[in-house]
Amino acid sequence: MPGQPIIAPSQAERADQSQRMAADGDSFAIHEWKGSGPPQLHVHHEDDEAWHVLEGGLRFRFADQTIDVNAGSTVFVPAGVAHTYVSLPDARYLVVLTPRLRELIAELSSAADRAGDDEIYRRYRSELLE
């Protein structure tokens, strides 16, 4: 059974408790990003992914819930958790990706025909769910 997403609120919203945030694997990249993810719920079967909101906010949708996060918040989505997100107005954020996810995004952004997205996701051990 896949793990659960970890939502770390901004420092101003944090309680005294803390949650451990860690990703398996031996390398990752951090990119500053704007814009939304794919509109469909999707899952990365072997790769973790994380976002840290610098400005504005993001709206994350999971299989059973939708959560808005604001500047200063971090969201960690372990491999196997279905998710997508929408960038709220004026959002600016960091996304933490494995090399495989970075390659998936690059191939999706260069694809001329969206009809082939299912196959592209499969090649990168990911899957569109909607």
State where each predicted segment sits.
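Actinobacteria-biased recognition of intrinsically disordered, low-complexity terminal regions
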Residues: 1-4, 11
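A short glycine-rich, His/Asp/Glu-containing loop-to-beta-strand
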Residues: 8-42, 47, 96
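Short, charged/polar surface micro-motifs in flexible loops or helix N-caps
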Residues: 26-27, 35-38, 57-59, 66, ...
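Glycine- and acidic-residue-biased ligand/ion/polar-headgroup-sensing regions
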Residues: 46-58, 63
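Short acidic-glycine-tyrosine-enriched beta hairpin
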Residues: 50, 64-82
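Ligand-binding loop in jelly-roll beta-barrel domains
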Residues: 79-104
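Acidic/histidine-enriched, glycine/proline-rich intrinsically disordered or flexible terminal extensions
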Residues: 104-130
